[in-house]
């Protein structure tokens, strides 16, 4: 007779988040803007670089919980580069999508 004891341990689900950017004209938020380039930073390290597509959207997936800074490094053609840094947090409580709508002024 062979006895074997098996123990199963529930693996904790990895919690990650996403950042979804929508880039629009400052004076007409219905006008979407493609070609804006952003960098995501965490603790002084660049995590990702995103470029908005023809729908004015860019998404970064699998962001670990923590505090991040989003910096625009290239404005869409004909628009002024924003010098604002946007802070956002990915929660360690649940999987989430952080959505930011960001505007640019025309040149």
Regions found by a protein language model. Give the residues of each.
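Solvent-exposed loop/turn and edge beta-strand elements of beta-rich ligand-binding domains
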Residues: 1-107
